[in-house]
């Protein structure tokens, strides 16, 4: 299943006037107000990061996210398209969130608003109101990793079935850039900067290029992506799923949690 949609494909959905289409602008409201896709509602997803993956933390995450998804009008019948300026981390976070809640009818706009605007497709400036719903999506624990799960996996040094993938910059991975109490990376993690997923024009690279980028990662393994706040890692999550990786989790707490927990191990 592919979790991206092209500008031409989305344009066709608009022309069909489908009432099951929900388009969500994941950029800051200041950007949305200057121009956005037709009928799009705005939710600044960067405001909803989560760095507590304790049992209680995940319980609260589930409750809060279901409220948000209900407020913006997600129902089981909706095909939900997220976009930001490019094929970025915020729209990817939205897609991951819906997949986590067992809603597979979702995609992110490849190339984002910038590509849509460059192609001179329809844009509007009026703010669109949410149509509230009651979202009933069921969390899928196989799509999310918490710190306890990762800790249990790296403790078993003989466990070769799991690969931890760090989507941050090389400097964050190596520890020369410090954004938490501790610097470095989760032990045994390999690093592929999420920005390598995207062309200079802001759209995703072709699958042939992405296959080459991730050729060192076996598809039969369980992959756990992480970054600092669970956004860049969401972009990598979407890429891997598009490439046919079936067993992919995202560590939603990421380094913002791991790097600030004194009892968790790190490597530099």
Positions of the model-derived regions?
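Cytosolic catalytic domains that perform sulfur/thiol-centered chemistry
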Residues: 1-268
